[in-house]
Curated annotation (Swiss-Prot):
This is 3-ketodihydrosphingosine reductase TSC10. GO terms for cellular component: endoplasmic reticulum membrane. The lineage of its organism: Eukaryota, Fungi, Dikarya, Basidiomycota, Agaricomycotina. One of its GO terms (biological process) is sphingolipid biosynthetic process. It comes from Cryptococcus neoformans var. neoformans serotype D (strain B-3501A) (Filobasidiella neoformans). The chain crosses the membrane at residues 288-308. It is a single-pass membrane protein. Belongs to the short-chain dehydrogenases/reductases (SDR) family. One of its GO terms (molecular function) is 3-dehydrosphinganine reductase activity.
Amino acid sequence: MPTPLALLLSAILIIGTYFAMPFWPFRKSNYDPRGKHCYITGGSSGLGKALAERLVKQGAHVTIVGRDSKKAEGVVEELKAIAAPGQIIQCIAADLTSPIASTNAIHAACKPHADQAPDYVYLCAGFSRPKLFVETTKQELKDGLDGVYWVSAYTAHEACQMMSKQRRTGKIIFVASFLSYVSFAGYSSYSPAKYALRGLSDALRSEMLLHNIDIHIFLPCGISGPGFDAENRTKPAVTKKIEEGDTPITPEVCAAALESGLKKGYYQITDNLVTEPIRLRSNGGVPTNNFLLDTLWLIVSSVGVPIWRMTADSAVRSFRAKVEKELEAKGYYVS
């Protein structure tokens, strides 16, 4: 016989579904890269490169942007080898933490396309250098914001202006992180910028309805590759302990998860079931992905997330003596 709690939850689901039906977000996705100009920041490695390969295979015209011109040119040659005749494959070398360079880069990319704004903009550029906050320099704090937030915000701003001025529909896809939802020891120079990126994306999702421009945000967990290896070189032991058991996925699997979400018309896209309870606890009132599943995940999150948080806090406390000893050896303390 069903328990009173089970009956109550069933009633909530049924009643909630009934009243939500008139506003149900049935999304028929118009995502189709074929023949579209796809502009990818951070496209010379990791997720950006894997995404570029997928898009080229689907018949898209692809522009990748990266700081290292030689590396980007090498990727372009790889992409051209799998492209069909007529596809425009190119690269732009630019430091996208500069507003001027960001503006110049996207306009240069559009020259072969009659100066028309890109159809799809994928903001994959960024980096993570985890450290304990008290050991992070002021410059590293600034670099974290520049290399995670501004590196995408400047390009998004110019893309929105280009699309709206030309009355063109399009898509802008932010690549954020699981750490845009939740943060912990070691990510004080990274998570704030990722939170800001989610805030910008949420605001634009609403505002760009005025211009019929679609905004999406991808929030993956760890992605294997050179970037992840560099991250681990500075990652504190306490951070590694909290992340113990987390296995990064390949850029190729990550890119497939991103496109799967875009094809479903999701606004917030994740690559891991573990992220779903966190997403529902922290989504800021944005559109759901699936009403019934999201309701169930929300119920799970009310138990699972507090348990995870207590476990993480316990791990941090267990490292207190070790961290104090290390800081003492470095002469950090004044007495």
